[in-house]
Regions:
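Active-site nucleophile-His-acid catalytic modules used for acyl/amide transfer and hydrolysis
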Residues: 202-250
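Alpha-helical transmembrane signal-anchor/signal-peptide segments
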Residues: 84-103
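Short, Lys/Arg-rich, polar N-terminal cytosolic tail immediately upstream
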Residues: 1-8
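Internal/C-terminal transmembrane anchor helices
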Residues: 61-84
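Membrane-embedded alpha-helical segments of integral membrane proteins
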Residues: 14-57
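Glycine-rich catalytic cores of cysteine/serine-nucleophile enzymes that process amide/ester linkages
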Residues: 107, 118-216
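Juxtamembrane extramembrane loops of integral membrane proteins
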Residues: 105-106, 112
C-alpha cells in the first residue's frame, strides 16, 4: 500500500515536471519565433495555436504531443546558429567599434568617443584618436552608476588613469541598431550586440551625472602596475576581437 502510494506520487511529480518543462520550453521558443524569424509577430500566433492544440489533444493524438517537443528543439538549434554581425546601421552612440594598437609602450586608441552634450539626446557626435604611454598606466577606478533611484541596479564602468593626468574610460554596453529601443526581453533573443566603448570621462561619466541625473560613485581599485597592465591588455584584446568576431550581449 505504502509503495503503491509512493509510486503514484512519483509518477504524478514526474508528470508535473514534464508539463512545466514543456511549458517553459514552449514559451521560450515563442520568443525565438517573435524576435528571430521573418514575420515573427504574425507567425508567433500560429505557433501558439499549434502548441495549444498539441497540448489539448495530447491524450487523443499522442503523435502531436510528441511532435510538440520537437518544435522547441528545432527552434533552439536555429537560435544557436544565428551569427552576430557588424553589418547594421547603428545608433550614433554605438556607431563605431574602438580599436587599440600597441607598439612597444605606445598605445594608440582609435574611435574614442568624445561627444559634446547639450542634453541626453542632443549632442555632437565626435570620435577621436588618443595616444597613451603604457609605462605611465598608474590607476584603475571602478564606477558604479544608479538610475531612477534604484540602489539595487547599477551600470558599472572602468577608468584607466595615467601619470600625465590622462584617463581612458571603458563601458560594456548593448550596441543598438537604428530604430531599436533598449529592452531586457529582446536582449535574451540575440537582438543586441555587445560593444566595449572607450571614451573620455567627460563623455561617459558626465552623460550619466549631468544629463541623466544618475547617482554615480567612483572607487579606486588597489592593484599593482603589473596586474594593471595585464588587465588593460586583456580588455584591448577583447575590444579588437569584436571587429572580426562580433558577439551578442547575452
Amino acid at each position: 500500500m505504502h509503495l503503491t502510494f509512493l509510486r503514484h506520487a512519483g509518477l504524478a511529480a514526474a508528470r508535473i515536471l514534464m508539463m512545466a518543462a514543456w511549458f517553459g520550453l514552449s514559451v521560450w521558443a515563442a520568443g525565438v519565433v517573435f524576435y528571430n524569424v521573418w514575420g515573427g509577430p504574425v507567425l508567433v500566433w500560429l505557433y501558439v495555436a499549434a502548441m495549444a492544440c498539441a497540448f489539448a489533444l495530447r491524450r487523443k493524438r499522442p503523435v502531436l504531443w510528441r511532435a510538440s517537443w520537437g518544435v522547441p528543439a528545432l527552434l533552439l538549434a536555429y537560435y544557436l546558429c544565428i551569427p552576430a554581425t557588424n553589418d547594421k546601421e547603428w545608433q550614433p552612440s554605438w556607431s563605431r567599434l574602438p580599436s587599440v594598437e600597441i607598439n612597444g609602450n605606445e598605445i594608440v586608441v582609435k574611435d574614442v568617443r568624445s561627444f559634446i552634450y547639450r542634453t541626453e539626446r542632443d549632442f555632437d557626435a565626435r570620435y577621436v584618436t588618443r595616444r597613451f604611454d603604457l609605462d605611465k598606466l598608474a590607476t584603475l577606478d571602478f564606477a558604479v552608476s544608479h538610475w531612477d533611484g534604484m540602489e539595487f541596479v547599477a551600470h558599472t564602468m572602468l577608468s584607466f588613469g595615467f601619470e600625465d593626468g590622462k584617463h581612458l574610460a571603458l563601458s560594456v554596453e548593448t550596441r543598438l541598431p537604428e530604430g531599436v529601443e533598449q529592452g531586457s526581453v529582446p536582449g535574451l533573443y540575440k537582438q543586441f550586440n555587445v560593444i566595449y566603448i572607450l571614451a573620455d570621462e567627460e563623455d561617459l561619466f558626465a552623460l550619466r551625472t549631468n544629463y541623466r541625473k544618475e547617482d554615480m560613485y567612483l572607487y579606486r581599485i588597489n592593484i599593482d602596475r603589473e596586474n594593471l597592465k595585464k588587465a588593460f591588455l586583456g580588455f584591448a584584446e577583447k575590444i579588437n576581437s569584436l571587429h572580426e568576431r562580433p558577439r551578442y550581449y547575452h
